[in-house]
Amino acid sequence: MLMASPPLASEKERESNETIKIRKPYNPTDMENKKHYNVVAAVVVDDGKYLCMQRCRSQYAYITEHWEFPGGKVEEGETDHHTLLREIKEEMDWDIYVGRKLGSVIQEYPDFCITLTAYLCKGGDKAFKLLDHLDYKWLAREELDALNWTEGDRKLLALLP
């Protein structure tokens, strides 16, 4: 059975179709073309509560003032362990004890990608300072979902003990 071809669109239909925004299909190479960072996070637990830090303003609106576990980018030649000690000292003037690895997640943001690796940590004896964050909270596991997390850190919640 022969099928008739669809009628050609009228000029009016063509004009209206030109204004429709078509979503670009997912292309796995898009992530490969972005800058990629290895990032580590300290999941600090004290008396059953998790330390959550609120980010400062950023050039990237999608992470500005969102919540995260403290940490930072792994520099060339650094181990994850050394990076955590350095970043927490720089951002909080605090010494921590780095424990076991909880796992890693990959997060693609509009401008870059990260592999985020979390470690279970214990805080040092003295109090920390807010040198690079707006605020902090100690929260029980069941309270964590209520925060406005960065997308990468939100994925880490599934790895928490």
Annotate each predicted stretch with a short phrase.
Residues 1-3:
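Methionine residue identity
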Residues 5, 10, 14-16:
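Low-acidity, Ser/Thr- and Arg-rich intrinsically disordered low-complexity segments
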Residues 14-30:
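Short, Lys/Arg-enriched N-terminal segments with co-localized hydrophobic residues
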Residues 30-51, 73:
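Conserved N-terminal beta-strand and adjoining loop/helix that marks the start
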Residues 46, 95, 104-127, 135-137, ...:
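Active-site-adjacent beta-strand/loop module that shapes the phosphate/pyrophosphate-binding cleft
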Residues 49-90:
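Conserved Nudix-box catalytic region and its N-terminal flanking loop in Nudix hydrolases
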Residues 91-98:
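Short secondary-structure junctions
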Residues 120, 128-160:
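NUDIX/MutT-family hydrolases
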